[in-house]
């Protein structure tokens, strides 16, 4: 129950862990660094998968599956890639009771094993573009783990595409990062900034990385999705060439992009409260719980509750009834608040005689009467839409209230725990590294949204807050997960 959850103001990190476990979203595994995703948590992932998969297919992508094990020779073909991932890799050295002739890496990401296949499949410009997505698990050996946010094994999707021209590849990079932005904002009700990573923060082996960044309730940033322009790096490493329309042999241009179960952690930290989980209706596998107040003619009340649930379900709203008698209505109210059910309906004998029920919103706690007539399902649908929009609006207002410009390093240090900081940077990696070492803050992105850039005069020349060197523009700094 909610009384087992540490208040956010007391200990935000403990609040998060308490909530994840109390709401039965995930639990620790006996395997160090790994987690068990429980049914409540996996139901959220299934909703995310369904929405994203539809968006991928609407943009022309298809699903496939590639091996979990990657030969060491594949990994070594792209030097920057292996340098970036080597410390995180799990390596298989024995199989079938014998030492393997070649080590096998447990998939940290699939570029290398996928490009070994693409080399076989791509011969001509007619084979392009190749637009493939994979739903899979990956392993990156983590020393400090946190449920959903950072674990040694996690679930994700990874898109890998091949193109005939650099322009087509760049269009794909931007298309997919905008798909992620749309998903985050329209499904997760979580506003995000969109932009490019600095060279030191980009994906290992990429020419350029684009990302979306969200602000959590503790004012830290969370990277919620990435899209990488891989140039011709992997094509050259795997000698993947195609015959162009002009008859010449050319290397293909590549992208990759992905999101993971980390989004569940983001969803929790963006919206939830001290009573438990708060879910946007579009990602709630159970959107409405009906709690009958079993007094008087209990059977009539229970039957009405089930009839209402049937009506909602037939209208595409996922509803269920809890008419068990071993727990009180008050216990049920608290339990379903903990689980984040967006709407609770209360109905008793007097409500039936008045032809109404009481609807309670999980996000605000507000209650209202709903008429039990032919407008009932439409009223609940409108309420769910209002909750979805209200959650996004609230999160956006929170981010805007905690985003500020700073003009000096002293001010930067004082404000870095207060949200997103907009500040001048001289473009040098050594300056970026110094700021990170001294403040634990990183450049989250170079934002590309025109309205955001205009609001904060991002292109205005100035002086770097740290080095005092000339700066061509501003970037977004924050502490991050």
UniProtKB/Swiss-Prot annotation:
UniProt KW Nucleotide-binding keyword: yes
Example of a GO cellular component annotation carried by this entry: cytoplasm
Source taxon at top rank: Bacteria
Cellular location(s): Cytoplasm
Paired cysteines (S-S): none
Gene3D superfamilies tied to this protein: Anticodon-binding domain, Bira Bifunctional Protein, Domain 2, C-terminal domain of ProRS
Function: Catalyzes the attachment of proline to tRNA(Pro) in a two-step reaction: proline is first activated by ATP to form Pro-AMP and then transferred to the acceptor end of tRNA(Pro).
Family affiliation: Belongs to the class-II aminoacyl-tRNA synthetase family. ProS type 3 subfamily.
The protein's name: Proline--tRNA ligase
Organism name: Chlorobium phaeobacteroides (strain BS1)
């Amino acid at each position: 129950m909610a009384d087992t959850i540490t208040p956010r103001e007391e200990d935000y990190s403990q609040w998060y862990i308490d909530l994840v476990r109390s709401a039965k979203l995930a639990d620790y595994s006996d395997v160090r660094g790994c987690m068990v995703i429980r049914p409540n948590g996996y139901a959220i992932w299934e909703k995310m998968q369904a929405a994203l998969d539809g968006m991928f297919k609407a943009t022309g992508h298809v699903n496939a599956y590639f091996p979990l094990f990657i030969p060491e020779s594949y990994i070594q073909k792209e030097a920057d890639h292996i340098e970036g991932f080597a410390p995180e890799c799990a390596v298989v050295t024995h199989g079938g009771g014998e030492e393997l002739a070649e080590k096998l890496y447990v998939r940290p990401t699939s570029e290398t094993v996928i490009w070994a296949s693409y080399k076989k499949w791509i011969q001509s410009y007619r084979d392009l573009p190749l637009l493939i997505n994979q739903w899979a698990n990956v392993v990156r050996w983590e020393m400090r783990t946190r449920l959903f946010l950072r674990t040694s094994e996690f679930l994700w999707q990874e898109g890998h595409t091949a193109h005939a021209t650099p322009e087509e590849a760049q269009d794909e990079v931007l298309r997919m990062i905008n798909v992620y932005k749309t998903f985050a904002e329209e499904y997760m009700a979580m506003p995000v900034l969109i932009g490019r990573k600095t060279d030191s923060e980009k994906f290992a082996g990429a020419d350029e990385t684009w990302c979306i960044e969200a602000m959590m309730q503790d004012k830290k940033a969370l990277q919620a999705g990435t899209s990488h322009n891989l140039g011709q790096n992997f094509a050259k490493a795997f000698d993947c060439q195609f015959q162009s329309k002009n008859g010449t042999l050319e290397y293909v241009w590549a992208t990759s992009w992905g999101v993971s179960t980390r989004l569940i952690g983001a969803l929790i930290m963006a919206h939830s409260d001290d009573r438990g989980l708060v879910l946007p209706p579009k990602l709630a596998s159970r959107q409405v719980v009906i709690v009958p107040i079993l007094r008087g003619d209990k059977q009539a009340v229970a039957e009405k509750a089930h009839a209402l649930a049937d009506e909602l379900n037939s209208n595409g709203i996922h509803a269920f009834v809890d008419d068990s008698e071993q727990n009180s209505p008050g216990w049920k109210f608290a339990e379903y608040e903990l689980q984040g059910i967006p709407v609770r309906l209360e109905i008793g004998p007097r409500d039936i005689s008045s032809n109404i029920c009481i609807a309670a919103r999980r996000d605000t706690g507000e209650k209202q009467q709903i008429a039990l007539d032919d407008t009932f399902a439409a009223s609940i649908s409108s309420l769910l839409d209002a909750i979805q929009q209200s959650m996004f609006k609230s999160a956006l207002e929170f981010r805007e209230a905690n985003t500020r410009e700073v003009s000096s390093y002293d001010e930067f240090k004082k404000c870095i725990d207060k949200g997103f900081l907009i500040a001048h940077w001289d473009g040098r990696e050594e300056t970026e590294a110094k700021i990170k070492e001294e403040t634990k803050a990183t450049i989250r992105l170079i934002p590309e949204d025109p309205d955001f850039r205009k609001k904060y005069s991002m292109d205005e020349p100035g002086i770097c807050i740290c080095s005092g060197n000339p700066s061509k523009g501003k970037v977004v700094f924050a502490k991050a997960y």
